[in-house]
């Protein structure tokens, strides 16, 4: 085989004058754009599933929200978010459709009404109240807590009518008294009922050198 001839390497850049080159450093390192790759859609990816109870959704099948083992009926919970954060409430049951927790203050002790809350926003304590005598009416479900929109689609100015404030209905007040009555009776029968009334009536707070991850609730 005939070997390759050692040809001299001639650079494209050369001195036009002392200290002045023909091409700059950025000009020599210029790289042309490459062809854009074609996008192929990945059809193997599965659609995410919504963790909801009840009806099926378009993105996937519904999944039952599992309840934490520490959340049993009668457990005293500490609310972590919302206007009532820090208050101690009594857990009644889990609503089947949404998976939210049905809790009450009772309202007479700490002003916490009958309402729903997610289990991610509560801390379960070791204290329990006997709620075996509580009978929750059948109409108290997820639809019961949904507020009806008062806005009407009209051509009038929406700012002229002013803001409509929410008012508690008489039916809601009656239901709160019905549910809270047996709970108050069970607290009064407790050997340490004075402590329970004071415990439920005060908000939870952290003092100096108190760390929640080191506390036993």
Curated annotation (Swiss-Prot):
Highest taxon in the source lineage: Eukaryota
Xref: SUPFAM superfamilies:
Translation proteins SH3-like domain (SSF50104)
The answer on whether this UniProt entry bears the keyword Heme reads no
Q: Does the keyword Ribosomal protein apply?
A: yes
One Pfam family, short name:
Ribosomal_L6e
- Organism, by scientific name, is Caenorhabditis elegans
Q: Got a GO cellular component term for this one?
A: rough endoplasmic reticulum
Question: PANTHER family under this entry?
Answer: 60S RIBOSOMAL PROTEIN L6, LARGE RIBOSOMAL SUBUNIT PROTEIN EL6
Its protein name is Large ribosomal subunit protein eL6
Give coiled-coil spans as residue ranges.
none
Which molecular function terms from Gene Ontology are attached?
RNA binding; structural constituent of ribosome
The entry assigns this protein to a family as follows: Belongs to the eukaryotic ribosomal protein eL6 family.
As recorded in Swiss-Prot or TrEMBL, the protein's gene is named rpl-6
Q: Where in the cell is it found?
A: Cytoplasm, Cytosol; Cytoplasm; Rough endoplasmic reticulum
Keywords for the protein's UniProt record, in alphabetical order: Cytoplasm, Endoplasmic reticulum, Ribonucleoprotein, Ribosomal protein
InterPro entries in the record: 60S_ribosomal_eL6, Rib_uL2_dom2, Ribosomal_eL6_CS, Ribosomal_eL6_KOW, Translation_prot_SH3-like_sf
General function of this protein: Component of the large ribosomal subunit.
Which Gene3D superfamilies is this protein grouped with?
A: 2.30.30.30
- List the top taxonomic levels of the source: Eukaryota, Metazoa, Ecdysozoa, Nematoda, Chromadorea
BP terms from Gene Ontology:
cytoplasmic translation; determination of adult lifespan
> What does the record note on quaternary structure?
Component of the large ribosomal subunit. May bind IPO9 with low affinity.
């Amino acid at each position: 085989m005939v070997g390759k001839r050692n040809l001299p390497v001639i650079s494209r850049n050369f001195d036009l004058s002392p200290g002045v080159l023909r091409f700059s450093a950025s000009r020599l390192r210029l790289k042309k754009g490459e062809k854009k790759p074609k996008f192929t859609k990945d059809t193997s990816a599965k659609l995410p599933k919504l963790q909801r109870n009840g009806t099926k959704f378009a993105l996937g099948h519904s999944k039952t929200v599992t309840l934490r083992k520490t959340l049993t009926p009668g457990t005293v919970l500490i609310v972590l978010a919302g206007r009532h954060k820090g208050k101690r409430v009594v857990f009644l049951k889990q609503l089947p459709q949404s998976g939210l927790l049905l809790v009450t203050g009772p309202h007479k002790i700490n002003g916490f009404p009958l309402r729903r809350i997610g289990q991610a926003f509560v801390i379960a304590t070791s204290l329990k109240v006997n709620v075996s005598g509580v009978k929750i009416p059948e109409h108290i479900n997820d639809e019961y807590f949904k507020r009806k929109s008062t806005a009407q689609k009209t051509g009038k100015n929406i700012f002229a009518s002013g803001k409509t404030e929410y008012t508690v209905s008489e039916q809601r007040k009656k239901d709160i008294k019905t549910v809270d009555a047996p709970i108050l009776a069970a607290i009064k029968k407790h050997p340490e009922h004075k402590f329970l009334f004071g415990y439920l009536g005060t908000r939870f707070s952290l003092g100096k050198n108190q760390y929640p991850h080191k506390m036993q609730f």
